[in-house]
């Protein structure tokens, strides 16, 4: 059964919580999904996005859950339940402060590869997000992240931004979280999609039968 108290608490956190609380992944994940879904439903209710008028949906990382709610593939309640489990498992995979993420702006592939190679001497680090040409995000252990931040100039990185997150998402350090999520996600019956869904993992259209495994893979895969 859906926990209404949980939603009420998250709603208060969204509007009145401080940055530190909202940066913790067990808070930010359900909060972002709830906010995204509220915006989507407002657009539909105001007929700015008529129901059934869109042919495809996609969501980046956590946004894939909002996209699934939007296309009818999963109910809002089930999405919140999965994100409660997903976010806790992600945080439990590494203690707060031991891992993180860093965005690199305006870098060519050889510069990124060299940064990863250099930083890996201080800890595990992985390519996590390929957002656009010249904008990627790395995930890893905090010593490796800090190495890049402190040595950005000598590594020829135009701009490095440490992200305000509490864990290193979308990399092998989240393997435990993927295993925990797999147990719970296999209990979900996904509905027939109202619109095509494009997967973060494959960048291709996926089906109701494929989405469960793709959501599990997404936890440890580049998106």
Model-based region annotation:
Residues 60-68, 73:
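Glycine-rich nucleophile elbow surrounding the catalytic serine of serine-hydrolase chemistry
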């Amino acid at each position: 059964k859906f926990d209404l108290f949980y939603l009420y608490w998250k709603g208060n956190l969204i509007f009145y919580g401080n940055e530190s609380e909202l940066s913790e992944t067990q808070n930010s994940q359900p909060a972002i999904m709830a906010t995204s879904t509220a915006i989507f439903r407002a657009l539909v209710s105001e007929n700015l996005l008529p129901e059934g008028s869109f042919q495809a949906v996609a969501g980046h990382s956590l946004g894939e859950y909002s996209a699934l709610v939007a296309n009818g593939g999963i109910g809002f309640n089930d999405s919140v339940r999965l994100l409660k489990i997903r976010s806790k498992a992600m945080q439990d995979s590494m203690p707060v402060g031991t891992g993180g993420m860093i965005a690199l702006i305006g870098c060519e592939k050889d510069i990124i590869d060299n940064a990863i190679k250099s930083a890996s001497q201080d800890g595990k680090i992985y390519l996590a997000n390929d957002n656009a040409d010249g904008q990627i995000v790395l995930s890893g252990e905090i010593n490796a992240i800090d190495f890049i931040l402190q040595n950005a100039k000598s590594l020829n990185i135009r701009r490095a931004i440490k992200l305000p997150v509490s864990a290193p998402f979308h990399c092998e350090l989240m393997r435990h979280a993927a295993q925990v999520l797999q147990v719970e996600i296999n209990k979900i019956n996904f509905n027939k999609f109202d619109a095509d869904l494009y997967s973060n993992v494959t960048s291709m259209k996926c089906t109701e039968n494929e989405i469960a495994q793709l959501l599990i893979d997404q936890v440890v895969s580049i998106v």
